[in-house]
Regions:
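Polytopic alpha-helical membrane-helix bundles and their juxtamembrane interface segments
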Residues: 1-37, 46-63, 73-185
Length: 185
């Protein structure tokens, strides 16, 4: 795996870290934790590539990317619901996020379906809340995972960098969208 692959993984980590910090400071803890999980995947990917521990860290990187992604997206959805006035306890939101990640671990084919369904729900809820930036970000991520990720047409290098660049852009859109919404009740 070429060293330059670490650049866009690091970008994901930086954007997610910044977004998580900003969301935490504005009392959006579920969204902050959701972004932090995506950032953790970026950190692990960056360490994996720059350290040369490609194979030893492969399963950890894949697991955190996929299962952390499911849990992170569930937490983003929970924050959207909380911002819409639903009294959703933190324990319930965390429990659902963990349960969905466990389900995806037990049935890997279901993980991709869950991710797509949650993205569609996030688009709809963001549009309903008039959070156009958030909706655009979630829609971009939906297109990213269906058209860009591991695309045979783009080649390995371009596919990797474009995918991670779009993930970082999605996280930025989502964070900025949450920051424009009122504080959770």
């Amino acid at each position: 795996m070429p060293l330059h692959y670490a650049l866009t993984d690091a970008l994901v980590a930086l954007v997610a870290g910044w977004g998580a910090l900003m969301l935490w400071r504005t009392d959006k803890p579920l969204a902050a934790l959701g972004l932090a999980l995506f950032g953790l995947a970026g950190v692990i990917g960056t360490i994996r590539i720059t350290s040369g521990l490609i194979e030893p860290l492969a399963m950890l990187h894949k697991g955190v990317s996929q299962l952390g992604g499911i849990a992170g997206l569930a937490l983003l959805l929970a924050q959207i619901l909380r911002n819409k006035g639903l009294r959703l306890g933190t324990g319930v939101a965390l429990g659902v996020a963990i349960a969905l990640a466990a389900l995806a671990a037990a049935l890997p084919a279901l993980g991709a379906i869950l991710f797509v369904v949650m993205l569609i729900a996030a688009i709809a809820l963001s549009l309903q809340s008039r959070n156009l930036l958030g909706a655009a970000g979630f829609a971009m991520m939906l297109l990213n995972i269906t058209l860009v990720r591991q695309s045979d047409y783009l080649g390995a290098d371009l596919s990797w960098h474009l995918y991670h660049l779009l993930v970082a852009t999605w996280l930025l859109c989502v964070a900025r969208g949450f920051l424009k919404e009122p504080r959770a009740a």
